[in-house]
């Protein structure tokens, strides 16, 4: 069957087929030759780098080459991502060097790689390269991709057939490597984790949720999109082609500061890479003599990184020689969007290699565009293209043909060309003015939502879709999370309220310019309704936070309602209020004017204060949990930790789609199964259906939001399946869940949870007849282990509960769900080796009931009501206690986990001891799972194994051997005939002599020098002959001894 090495070899073969050289890391000498890296802690093939610098910069004297290599490989301290950013600038832009040649002082930027001609570089894939850890010992990444001797890509691979060897484990290994061999990651540009089928790509600073797949190799060929085929093959073909990798590194890497000022690294997802490259190609054509100035439309769904895609596009565009240093004008239709995009580009100014400029007013716009002759990135709202009072047509500002206009959210305001009569004059839309001002400019539209059906002329204005990445693609890839919709909480008015309000209609008709709008505001903003709304919101949000840490946006119809609702909420929770901008759990974010009332003025903030609120709301640890808005923050605003939106404002179409996308960002409190939640107070189901229809008619795939009721129904089906498992008899007895739930004594409840877990384990010991799976709701094969089916279904129930747990209909199930989760905790404990993901820690913080608690995992030793240190796992008393336990199956799992951990930890560097007991454990468990051993027999075997292991550990003391001597004694004792012939005393003397001989003979990194290894083999062979080790087994013994010596190399050299 497949193992991890098979996946490694397959990956290396594929890399070679793409043009990479291959070298086996353990064959590469550390100190000499083309693959020398200084010492065992080195990570750069210095001579390869030196050779590349000479080749790519032939004009340099040798002293300058040395200086460049030294600058590129200089060790430093400090934040790893900051160090990585420093190196990235050297890699992309070159190393600045000063030197004297023929008496002339010269300054040059020296290339480390040739981005233009990939064939001038050397691409080498190296596996099993040993790197010294800062904690001692060594770390061995599976595969490292070197370009000109620089380690730019690292792979960590796992076995697809081992359930415990998952991508999370690979990610956690990277986290360990970053700590112990940090120098390797100073140069890194891509991290890849895979089990040979599933594959994910991430940046140096990405958390696990941000590692994403690479689903297509050709964006133009949509049929090439993969679902559950070979993601690793797709990633290798899409990213690791040498030419593509250099293009990716050069144009699709971005460094930013997060909300708390920490440097983070972002790299493009595949849809950004292909979409931007297609857009750049289309731009070059559109601006050519044959082009029509229509670049196209990029539709990348909200939350999938559209703003960063625009930045990547601008960065690559500015570097294209065909465009002769173009000017980029970014146009939005709202000030807040303009500011948000400007901030994104300002943070990424290293990528565009210039400082963007935000246009302040109409006069500055005209001046900048008219005077600009080359380059520049300008941000403006389209309203600044308005006519002056005396103008009938907008004047031409610049006739250059290398001006690119990026239109964010390409909808009607961006291409309003028709005239309308206003105050006796014909007026044209702003888009007409924009094109009059820049008659030879080319246009591209970026949108996160599809263009509405009524806007038939979109492609006539911007051109075809150059890239589509719709909602279904984004959710499947993990770029966004799904949205769940709850419309069961509408707050309606009673008849008395209606009568009183409609009595005011006559007055409104005389006083208000927009009667329907003002009437709607009065209806939604009536005091009695807001009192009810505030009460419901507070109750719902509190319940939501009991399930998962949450932040929320409340969207209302007017600024006055913002203030009135705020007052109602703080009347219920006065501790949420604070006048200090840096304190308080709830704030209002809205525009203001000088004529606002004093009550409203308290909630009007300066630009700097709004930035403070943005930072606070984006910080998951900040106490600001709720913001109330009317229009602000509903488009372009990105706060990934916001997972709930309350809608109390009638919306439709484009605006509705933009708003609800605020909760679809990837974050630890959301997942593919547990997405963002939309709570509807005004009845927008019809509008949501219409928006979905608009979405799918625009060739997009995916559902905008799933009904929370459908989640509830799915959860009930899942609960029913779990009940069938407990209703399946074991030795004639079923498990009575209802009786367990009625227990109010904690000890009794704990006992019931233990019995339930034992019942699930026992199901897999039955001879299978299929009956237990007749109601298996997710239609897996009937031979699927019942424990696995329970764990999966209980996990889905938990995630479903997070979304629909606030429904009144769910309350009767609260205790039952908590009970199943407690059972799940016991069963999964042995599989949680080390730290789990954040998702595991937060998915179910506290269920809404007072009887069953599911915080943490239950320790089996606690079930014996004894402190763990007082229990001897080797005592007969303990063995009998377990044998008499009604949960023997549970103890098998506990003992398996205990022994596996003991063997791994206490064997240390003793290879023979570790392999012997790992083999025994595996064989025993196979016997048990194949029903060749009963539960009592396997317990006997595991306890006997534990005793034998302790005796082997104590053997060194008995024989008077050190740790290293014992390791060699074990290696020599693998030959039973030698042990029988020579006896313990002679073998012990031989082990001591070999240890002493090696101590005197080995040097640092001896295992990498073939001449030294040959001499060591000779010395070992002489010692074996001296003590008359059986001749027919000597070569085998030499091999064992050398392997053991390599394992304890640093102990032998005294490092």
From Swiss-Prot:
<dbReference type="Pfam" id="PF18766">
    <property type="entry name" value="SWI2_SNF2"/>
</dbReference>
<dbReference type="InterPro" id="IPR014001">
    <property type="entry name" value="Helicase_ATP-bd"/>
</dbReference>
<dbReference type="InterPro" id="IPR007409">
    <property type="entry name" value="Restrct_endonuc_type1_HsdR_N"/>
</dbReference>
<dbReference type="InterPro" id="IPR055180">
    <property type="entry name" value="HsdR_RecA-like_helicase_dom_2"/>
</dbReference>
<dbReference type="InterPro" id="IPR004473">
    <property type="entry name" value="Restrct_endonuc_typeI_HsdR"/>
</dbReference>
<keyword id="KW-0067">ATP-binding</keyword>
<keyword id="KW-0680">Restriction system</keyword>
<protein>
    <recommendedName>
        <fullName>Type I restriction enzyme HindI endonuclease subunit</fullName>
        <ecNumber>3.1.21.3</ecNumber>
    </recommendedName>
</protein>
<comment type="subunit">
    <text>The type I restriction/modification system is composed of three polypeptides R, M and S; the restriction enzyme has stoichiometry R(2)M(2)S(1) while the methyltransferase is M(2)S(1).</text>
</comment>
<keyword id="KW-0540">Nuclease</keyword>
<feature type="domain" description="Helicase ATP-binding">
    <location>
        <begin position="287"/>
        <end position="468"/>
    </location>
</feature>
<dbReference type="InterPro" id="IPR051268">
    <property type="entry name" value="Type-I_R_enzyme_R_subunit"/>
</dbReference>
<keyword id="KW-0238">DNA-binding</keyword>
<dbReference type="InterPro" id="IPR040980">
    <property type="entry name" value="SWI2_SNF2"/>
</dbReference>
<dbReference type="GO" id="GO:0003677">
    <property type="term" value="F:DNA binding"/>
</dbReference>
<dbReference type="GO" id="GO:0005524">
    <property type="term" value="F:ATP binding"/>
</dbReference>
<keyword id="KW-0547">Nucleotide-binding</keyword>
<dbReference type="InterPro" id="IPR021810">
    <property type="entry name" value="T1RH-like_C"/>
</dbReference>
<dbReference type="GO" id="GO:0009307">
    <property type="term" value="P:DNA restriction-modification system"/>
</dbReference>
<comment type="similarity">
    <text>Belongs to the HsdR family.</text>
</comment>
<dbReference type="InterPro" id="IPR027417">
    <property type="entry name" value="P-loop_NTPase"/>
</dbReference>
<dbReference type="Pfam" id="PF11867">
    <property type="entry name" value="T1RH-like_C"/>
</dbReference>
<comment type="function">
    <text>The restriction (R) subunit of a type I restriction enzyme that recognizes 5'-RAACN(5)TAG-3' and cleaves a random distance away. Subunit R is required for both nuclease and ATPase activities, but not for modification. After locating a non-methylated recognition site, the enzyme complex serves as a molecular motor that translocates DNA in an ATP-dependent manner until a collision occurs that triggers cleavage.</text>
</comment>
<keyword id="KW-0378">Hydrolase</keyword>
<keyword id="KW-0255">Endonuclease</keyword>
<dbReference type="GO" id="GO:0009035">
    <property type="term" value="F:type I site-specific deoxyribonuclease activity"/>
</dbReference>
<dbReference type="Pfam" id="PF04313">
    <property type="entry name" value="HSDR_N"/>
</dbReference>
<dbReference type="Pfam" id="PF22679">
    <property type="entry name" value="T1R_D3-like"/>
</dbReference>
């Amino acid at each position: 069957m497949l193992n991890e090495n098979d996946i490694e070899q397959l990956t290396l073969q594929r890399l070679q087929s793409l043009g990479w050289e291959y070298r086996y890391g353990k064959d590469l000498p550390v100190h000499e030759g083309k693959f020398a890296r200084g010492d065992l802690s080195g990570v750069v093939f210095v001579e390869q780098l030196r050779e590349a610098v000479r080749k790519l910069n032939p004009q340099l004297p040798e002293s300058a080459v040395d200086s460049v290599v030294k600058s590129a490989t200089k060790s430093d301290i400090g934040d790893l991502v900051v160090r990585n950013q420093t190196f990235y600038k050297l890699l992309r832009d070159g190393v600045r060097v000063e030197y004297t040649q023929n008496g002339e002082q010269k300054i040059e930027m020296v290339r480390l790689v040739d981005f233009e001609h990939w064939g001038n570089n050397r691409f080498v894939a190296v596996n099993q390269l040993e790197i010294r850890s800062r904690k001692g010992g060594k770390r061995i990444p599976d595969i490292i991709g070197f370009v000109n001797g620089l380690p730019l890509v690292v792979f960590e691979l796992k076995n697809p057939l081992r359930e415990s060897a998952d991508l999370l484990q690979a990610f956690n290994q990277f986290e360990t490597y970053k700590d112990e061999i940090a120098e390797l990651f100073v140069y890194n540009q891509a991290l890849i984790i895979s089990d040979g089928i599933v594959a994910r790509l991430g940046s140096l600073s990405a958390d696990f949720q941000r590692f994403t797949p690479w689903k297509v190799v050709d964006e133009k060929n949509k049929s090439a999109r993969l679902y559950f085929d070979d993601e690793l093959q797709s990633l290798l073909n899409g990213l690791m082609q040498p030419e593509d990798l250099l293009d990716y590194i050069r144009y699709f890497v971005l460094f930013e500061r997060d909300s708390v000022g920490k440097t983070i690294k972002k790299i493009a997802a595949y849809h950004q890479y292909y979409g931007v490259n297609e857009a750049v190609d289309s731009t070059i054509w559109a601006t050519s003599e044959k082009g029509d100035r229509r670049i196209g439309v990029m539709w990348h769904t909200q939350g999938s990184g559209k703003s960063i895609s625009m930045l990547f596009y601008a960065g690559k565009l500015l570097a294209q020689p065909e465009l002769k240093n173009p000017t980029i004008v970014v146009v939005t239709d709202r000030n807040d969007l303009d500011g948000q995009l400007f901030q994104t580009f300002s943070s990424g100014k290293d990528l565009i290699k210039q400082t963007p400029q935000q246009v302040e007013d109409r006069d500055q716009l005209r001046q900048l565009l008219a005077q600009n002759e080359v380059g520049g990135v300008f941000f403006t709202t389209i309203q600044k293209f308005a006519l002056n009072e005396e103008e009938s047509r907008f004047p031409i500002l610049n006739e250059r043909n290398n001006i690119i206009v990026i239109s964010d959210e390409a909808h009607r305001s961006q291409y309003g060309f028709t005239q309308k009569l206003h105050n006796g004059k014909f007026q044209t839309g702003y888009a007409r003015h924009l094109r009059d001002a820049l008659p030879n400019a080319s246009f591209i539209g970026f949108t996160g939502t599809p263009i509405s059906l009524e806007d038939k002329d979109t492609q006539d204005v911007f051109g075809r879709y150059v890239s589509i990445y719709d909602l279904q693609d984004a959710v499947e890839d993990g770029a966004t999370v799904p949205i769940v919709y709850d419309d069961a909480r509408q707050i309606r008015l009673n008849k008395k309220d209606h009568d009183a309000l409609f009595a005011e209609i006559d007055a409104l008709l005389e006083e208000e310019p927009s009667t329907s709008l003002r009437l709607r505001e009065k209806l939604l903003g009536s005091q009695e309704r807001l009192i009810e709304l505030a009460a419901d919101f507070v109750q719902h949000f509190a319940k939501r936070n009991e399930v998962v840490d949450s932040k929320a946006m409340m969207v209302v119809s007017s600024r006055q309602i913002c203030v009135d609702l705020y007052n109602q909420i703080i009347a219920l929770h006065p501790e949420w209020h604070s006048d200090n901008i840096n304190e308080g759990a709830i704030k209002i974010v809205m525009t203001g004017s000088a004529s606002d009332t004093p009550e409203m003025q308290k909630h009007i903030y300066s630009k700097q204060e709004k930035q403070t609120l943005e930072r606070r709301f984006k910080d998951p640890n900040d106490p600001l949990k709720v913001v109330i808005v009317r229009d602000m923050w509903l488009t372009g605003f990105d706060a990934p930790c916001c997972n709930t939106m309350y809608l109390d404002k009638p919306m439709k179409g484009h605006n509705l789609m933009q708003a609800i996308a605020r909760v679809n960002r990837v974050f630890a409190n959301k997942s593919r199964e547990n997405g963002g939640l939309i709570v509807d107070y005004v009845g927008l189901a019809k509008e949501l259906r219409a928006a979905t229809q608009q979405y799918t008619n625009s060739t997009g795939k995916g559902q905008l939001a799933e009904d929370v009721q459908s989640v509830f129904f799915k959860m009930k089906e899942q609960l029913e399946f779990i009940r069938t498992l407990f209703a399946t008899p074991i030795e004639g007895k079923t498990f009575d869940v209802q009786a367990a739930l009625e227990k109010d004594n904690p000890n009794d409840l704990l006992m019931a949870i233990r019995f339930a877990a034992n019942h699930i384990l026992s199901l897999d010991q039955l001879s299978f007849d299929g009956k237990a799976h007749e109601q298996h709701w997710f239609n897996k094969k009937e031979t699927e282990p019942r424990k696995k089916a329970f764990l999966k279904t209980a996990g889905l129930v938990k995630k479903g509960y997070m979304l629909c747990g606030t429904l009144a209909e769910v309350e009767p199930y609260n205790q039952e769900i908590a009970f199943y989760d407690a059972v799940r905790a016991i069963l999964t404990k042995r599989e949680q080796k080390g730290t789990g993901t954040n998702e595991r820690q937060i998915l179910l913080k506290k269920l809404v009931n007072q009887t069953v608690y599911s915080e943490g995992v239950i320790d089996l030793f606690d079930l014996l009501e004894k402190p763990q240190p007082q229990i001897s796992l080797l005592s007969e008393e303990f063995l009998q206690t377990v044998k008499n336990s009604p949960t023997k199956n549970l103890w098998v799992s506990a003992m398996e986990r205990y022994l596996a951990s003991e063997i791994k930890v206490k064997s240390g560097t003793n290879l023979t001891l570790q392999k012997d007991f790992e083999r025994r454990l595996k064989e025993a468990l196979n016997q048990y799972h194949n029903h060749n051993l009963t539960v009592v027999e396997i317990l006997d075997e595991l306890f006997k194994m534990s005793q034998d292991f302790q005796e082997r550990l104590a053997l060194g003391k008995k024989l008077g051997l050190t740790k290293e001597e014992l390791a060699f004694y074990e290696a020599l004792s693998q030959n039973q005939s030698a042990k029988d012939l020579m006896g313990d005393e002679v073998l012990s003397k031989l082990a001591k002599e070999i240890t002493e001989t090696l101590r005197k003979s080995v040097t640092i990194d001896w295992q990498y020098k073939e001449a030294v290894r040959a001499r060591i083999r000779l010395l070992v062979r002489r010692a074996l002959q001296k003590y008359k080790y059986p001749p027919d087994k000597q070569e085998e013994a030499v091999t064992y001894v050398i392997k053991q010596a390599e394992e304890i190399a640093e102990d032998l050299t005294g490092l």
